[in-house]
Amino acid sequence: MALISVKTILTSLSLFHITLAFFFFTNPETIADQALVYMLGEAMGMPTTTKFNVPSPATSLLAMVLLSVGLSDILSLSMPEEVWLVHHWGSQAPLRFLFFVVVLATTWLGAPSAPRRPGANGIMSRPVAVAGTGSGGGWDGMRNRVVFTLVFVEMLSWFWVWVTLREEARALQDKKRRRNSSGGDRHL
């Protein structure tokens, strides 16, 4: 059995999304100045960006998306346990994990300091990311420390949810099987 239940992890992750939504809407620089963003950015050679210094239409849209995801995820936990544990999150957790793995790989491999990228200054160079000016279109706006850290934390969180979910779903199925087998003996 897991130390922390999947319901607790999902509730915490939903509240994390709602909190991020507040900061992206009101003051995105607060997120960009976090120690975790700095440490992961430095360790992975991700460029800094000035796009999170003031609220913008993009950060406001991100805030609304995070708010809706956080609220819908926390509301999904009010369904019956078997429905959200097995059916809803059983498919959502691996899909979200896979999505964030792809976005993380694209963000890191497409960064100006990524290995094997033409014109890269080296793995540990830290240029300032200028969003939307390169040939990569919208992907260039995602190649920075803030996005990398957010996607990295999301990927780790969804992997944790997925692993814990599988354990708890298996335990729920075993409990259901035992209950059905003991219930059938009483009728004989």
Give the location of each predicted region.
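Perimembrane loop-to-helix junctions flanking transmembrane segments
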Residues: 32-52
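Alpha-helical transmembrane segments of multi-pass membrane proteins
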Residues: 18-32
